[in-house]
Structure formats: structure tokens, C-alpha cells
Amino acid sequence: MADEDLIFRLEGVDGGGSSGAGRHGDSDTDSDDDEGYFICPITDDHMSNQNVNSKGQGYYNNLLKTECGSTGSPASSFHFKEAWKHAIEKAKHMPDPWAEFHLEDIATEHATRHRYNAVTGEWLKDEVLIKMASQPFGRGAMRECFRTKKLSNFLHAQHWKGASNYVAKRYLEPVDRSVYFEDVQLQMEAKLWGEEYNRHKPPKQVDIMQMCIIELKDRQGQPLFHLEHYIEGKYIKYNSNSGFVRDDNIRLTPQAFSHFTFERSGHQLIVVDIQGVGDLYTDPQIHTEKGTDFGDGNLGVRGMALFFYSHACNRICQSMGLAPFDLSPREQDAVNQSTKLLQSAKTILRGTEEKCGSPRIRTLSGSRPPLLLRLSENSGDENMSDVTFDSLPSSPSSATPHSQKLDHLHWPVFGDLDNMGPRDHDRMDNHRDSENSGDSGYPSEKRSDLDDPEPREHGHSNGNRRPESDEDSLGSSGRVCVETWNLLNPSRLHLPRPSAVALEVQRLNALDLGRKIGKSVLGKVHLAMVRYHEGGRFCEKDEEWDQESAIFHLEHAADLGELEAIVGLGLMYSQLPHHILADVSLEETEENKTKGFDYLLKAAEAGDRQSMILVARAFDTGLNLSPDRCQDWSEALHWYNTALETTDCDEGGEYDGIQDEPQYALLAREAEMLLTGGFGLDKNPQRSGDLYTQAAEAAMEAMKGRLANQYYEKAEEAWAQMEE
């Protein structure tokens, strides 16, 4: 068979072969037996099955030598070619699982196929021939599935018995046509992250099934269907978009993959709802920071919080340098129950796993794919760039109390990275095309009903007719793909970020205040944990919700610059009314008073007007002032002035106007302080009279005529003292 007759290139694979090809019903356990060859069971010679483990290990070692040494020899290339050709011959002679349904006898339909390129963000159109069963063979909460055969565009004759089996899915209830396109975008974006995960050489590689849209032009209304390959095997749901993990399906790889996507994307997204056959996944869900992409299943930071509440870091997470998410002691005890179950998983680490963000990995991080360009920029800084890690310290400094326990993760100190300029990156090796795509045929599960976001509209563009190759999400040519990726906004590079608060705090400490408050997605995740605890999501109906854990996450959110958390803790520790965790009251101690005032002062510096007034009054009257401070009218005057000038958005992006404290009242208090002097403030009758006049004018605007007259009189009295 000539090379050009293949629908994929014959070349060496980086750290593993095609994931998911040939997965079967036994794939619900992490067995290491199917990894003796990187080209999995379909290529195993029946004469060498007894030596598969030893030969597989030798093959793996030779592959490592090839990667680290020369670019490869003709002998090694020949080995790959023969293995792939052998696999193709075996695949050709496999029986058709749908032969009994005689789909070849169904009428042929013309369809327009829409495929999405996740790298360029473009939609491509071509024409295909299909045969679809009239009755569904499976039905879920939202969609139903139809057996389908699609004829390859490479064929010159219509040989339907040899056509590939597909699953066509459509929604049970009518939905906007844009929903179909949005679903494909989601799955192809998730496929990109699966490929990024595989570049870090995990023990088991993953793959997301290829999915496209077919438009049946000859039917009334030209209905749309999702189209995926059919894959035999046992379909398992490993986690959901609401953080649920089945105890009898505990596995390491799916959970580690979700955790990896959160850190590798710089906290901008997480891929969850992992389900499929073995490590060939379908119908995933992506949670993004704002939650405005990818339909109603995108729960935003709340979905991220739900995942980490139930996630127990496993040995794959540790081998890839993924930092554990901070949980309270009580939450950690609950997660430890899952940790015990993880001991039964059979995945064996090879010891060659790359750390997340390792300089040895030539990833596609030279620029952002369209999804990351669409996401909120809050998690990144304008001058931030993706730099290689070999010039950085291998462990964080001890600036925070939890730094020492994170040294083994080899995360760099982020404080010096946010203001660095772009650096040259090594070009990535040509990315191989993938023909591994399919589906278990299982209908999609219903998305979570936790949210009801505003509807989104996503259009699509038409492209030229493309060859039949079911290319992976990076396109049909690895070389073209990498060149295209590198052309996309090379100045906007993203850096992996750990899930640990201590390391995120180090990064934020290097930023100025305006770029620190409200800029951490990790802080928003911890704040979402607070809301879930307060709402009773993490407890049974007849149980009290965990107040200690809620305060734990509220403090972590405040440490990460979440203004709402900072204000809430300031009010809570100061024994003042607070809207977040309103039922929680803390003991009134000097230590808590100091904490409360420090939080309020931090919130005031961040632009929260209510906190400015509280701090000013504390310095003015001495009430609610921390024990280590004393009355200071000059400080009070400063914060009164700042509050008066604050009429726009604070650093958290929220608008806080002057309705809570009338402007004329603050001006009158300033005038009174300057008229009498004291507590470090010198008398200034002239300025006092001016402020009384401004207060009178503000009172007149507020329809307070009698009060305005009083202020005018006091202004005259102040100016009289100046003349004396």
C-alpha cells in the first residue's frame, strides 16, 4: 500500500500512539497491559502476545532514544509503516457490528457536512453521502441516536457494506440551529486540550472523538444532526459537569486530565463531564471563567468549584506536577475517602511524565487558540508572556506559609513573570494527523440545571470543499497547523498556573493593586465554594452547612484579591452587618478587630467606597479602629476625600455610587474637622468655609433646603474665624 493512499501520515509518535483506537469493554479499569505497544492491541501480532510486555518496554525505550537522539533512521520509519499497514489490514477484516441491520439497503441521502477547525476557528463545508436508519437505537435525556453509514469521498464506487459506521444525534426538543454548531466547537476545543495533555507523556493518552454536523438538504426543514464515529465498548461516565464522580468507576486518567486542563490553560477553563469508552471521550463540557461559551452546561467558575470539591489528586496529578486545590480540613477528610478508592486503580507510572509547563515539552503554547482569545482577560495580564521555565527557579520561595509543602511540584516563582516581554520559542515538531475518532453511540446526558445563563448566538462561516480525511482538531496537515497557530496573536501567550493559593499569591504580590484585585480566576473559584456552602449544596438537607469551610474559602478568596471576599471579611471581623455568610458571627477579640480593620483598609485601597467611609469614620471617631491604631483626623480626611471622589467603578469592576452616604454629609464632616482641628489635623477655617459651601450646594441639589441654609451659616462662621 502506497503512503499516499493512507488517510494519515506514517511517522513516529511522540510518547505514545493513538489513544482510544480499539478500546473495548474492559477499559473501565486502568490496566497497563494494553500499552505494551504504542500502536495498541489491533497491531499486536498473535505470535508475540506472550512477550508483549517485555517487547513493549524495549520498544518504548528505543522510542525514547530516537526522540532524544537523532531524527530517526529508515529502519525505524519502516517499522512504523509496517505496523500501521498491519493494523489497517486487520481493521479491514473486522466484522461489521451493524451488519444485521442492513443499512446498505436504506435510501441514500445527500448531506452537507460542517467541520470546525479549532486552531483557526473556521468552519469548512463539503458534500457527503449517508444512509441513516429511520428509527433511533438510543435515547437520552436530551438527544436521540440513529445508526448511520457515511461513504468516504475517497472512494470512486459506492461500496456501502464497507462504509464506516457513524452515530447521528439530534435534540429531542427543537433548539436553535446555533446550538449544534456550538456543541461541535466545544468538542473540538476539548480535543485540542486532549492533544496538549498527551504531549506531556502521561501514562495513558486520551482522545476526544471527532464530531461534525450534517445538514440533510433533501428533508423538510433541512434538519441538522451531530455525526460521530461509532465505537464498540463499554460506555462509562467518569465525572460530570457538576463535579460528580462515581465510586465504582474511579479512575486516575479522566480526573487528572480535567485537573491538567485547568492549570495548563492558566485557569481560563476546565474540561469536565468526561465519559466514553476507555480513554476515548465524547460529549465533554468546558467551564470557562465567565460561563458565556458553549451553552447552558457551562457553569463558569461554579463548575470549576464543583469539580475541585470532589477531586482527589492522584499519582498522575503528582507526576505531572499539578498542585492540589486548597480544601478545608473537613473537606479534605471527605476527599480522603475517595483517595483510598484510588489505590485500586491499576495505572502504572512510567516515570517519564512531563511537568505541566515543562520546558522540555514543545507545546502549541506559542500563541492562543481562538477559544483562549475569546475568554476573559481577567485571568491574564496584558504584558504577561509564556516563558520557558529553564531560566526560572525550580521551586517557589518561602514568601507564603504553605510554600515549603509545594516545593516538590517544581513550580516557578510567578512574581517575576507577569511583566516579562515575549521570548523566542522553539518550533514544535510537526504534529501528526490523527484518525482516531469515534463514539460509543450513547446519547448525551442532560446538562446540569444549576444555571440558566443568557442565550448565546454563535454563527459559522462557510469554507471550501476539503478532502475526506477526518483530520484531528489541528487540521489535516501538522506543518500547516503549527504555522497557522503561530500566526495567531503571538503576543498573547499564556502561562500555566497552579491550583494552589500559595503560588497564586506569589504571582499577585508582584502586581500593582489595580491589576491584583479581581484578576485571579482561582479566587473566584474559592468564592464560588463559599456560595455553595452557604446555599447548602455540600450538605444533606437535614444537616447544618459547614461554616468553617465557608470561612476557609472566603479567606483564600480574599488573599487572591476578590473584593467581595475582602469586604465581607472586613465587616464580619469588625462585628458589622455583612451580606455574605450573613448567618456567621465571629468572636469579638482584639485579633479579630485588627483583622477586620486590615481587610477594610485593603478594600478601601482597592476602591470600595463603603470601606473608605468605614475606615474614615474609624480614624475620625475611634470606633471600630484596630487596637494597634489611634484616632488620626488627617487619615480620616484623606479617606473622606477619596470617598467623595469615587464615583466610578472600583477595582473589582463594580459601580458603587453615593447613594449609601450623601455627599453633603461627608463634606460637612470634613468642614467640621477642619474648623476645630485636632488628632493630628491643623485648623483651616478658610477651607472649612469652602467645604461648608460645597455641602450647602450638594444639599440644595438633594432638595434639602433647610439643611443647605444651615451649612451656609456655618460657612460664614468659619470665614469669620479666618478674619479674626
UniProtKB/Swiss-Prot annotation:
Q: Where is the composition biased (Gly residues)?
A: 13-22
PTM-bearing positions, type Phosphoserine: 18, 27, 70, 73, 77, 242, 358, 365, 391, 397, 434, 444, 469, 473, 476, 499
- List all disulphide bridges recorded for this chain: none
EC numbers, comma separated: 2.7.11.20
Organism's domain of life?
Eukaryota
* UniProt-annotated stretches for the region Disordered: 11-35, 353-476
The chain residues annotated with the modification N-acetylalanine are 2
Q: In which tissues is it expressed?
A: Widely expressed, with high levels in reticulocytes and skeletal muscle.
List of residues that carry Phosphothreonine: 347, 352
Q: Which SUPFAM superfamilies match?
A: HCP-like, Protein kinase-like (PK-like)
Provide an example Pfam family for this protein. Alpha_kinase
Mind telling me which CDD domains this protein's record contains?
Alpha_kinase_eEF2K (cd16967)
Instruction: Summarize the activity regulation.
Output: Undergoes calcium/calmodulin-dependent intramolecular autophosphorylation, and this results in it becoming partially calcium/calmodulin-independent.
Catalysed reaction(s) here are:
[translation elongation factor 2] + ATP = [translation elongation factor 2]-phosphate + ADP + H(+)
Where's the Alpha-type protein kinase domain? Answer: 115-325
Q: How is it modified after translation?
A: The N-terminus is blocked. Autophosphorylated at multiple residues, Thr-347 being the major site. Phosphorylated by AMP-activated protein kinase AMPK at Ser-397 leading to EEF2K activation and protein synthesis inhibition. Phosphorylated by TRPM7 at Ser-77 resulting in improved protein stability, higher EE2F phosphorylated and subsequently reduced rate of protein synthesis. Phosphorylation by other kinases such as CDK1 and MAPK13 at Ser-358 or RPS6KA1 and RPS6KB1 at Ser-365 instead decrease EEF2K activity and promote protein synthesis.
**Region entry Calmodulin-binding, spans:** 80-93
* Main enzyme class: transferase
Q: Which sites bind ATP?
A: 295-301
An example molecular function term from Gene Ontology annotations: calmodulin binding
Keywords annotated in UniProt: Acetylation, ATP-binding, Calcium, Calmodulin-binding, Kinase, Nucleotide-binding, Phosphoprotein, Serine/threonine-protein kinase, Transferase
Low complexity bias (residue ranges): 364-376
Q: What does this protein do?
A: Threonine kinase that regulates protein synthesis by controlling the rate of peptide chain elongation. Upon activation by a variety of upstream kinases including AMPK or TRPM7, phosphorylates the elongation factor EEF2 at a single site, renders it unable to bind ribosomes and thus inactive. In turn, the rate of protein synthesis is reduced.
Family statement drawn from the similarity comment of this UniProt entry: Belongs to the protein kinase superfamily. Alpha-type protein kinase family.
Q: What is this protein called?
A: Eukaryotic elongation factor 2 kinase
What is the species of this protein? Answer: Rattus norvegicus (Rat)
Q: Which gene encodes it?
A: Eef2k
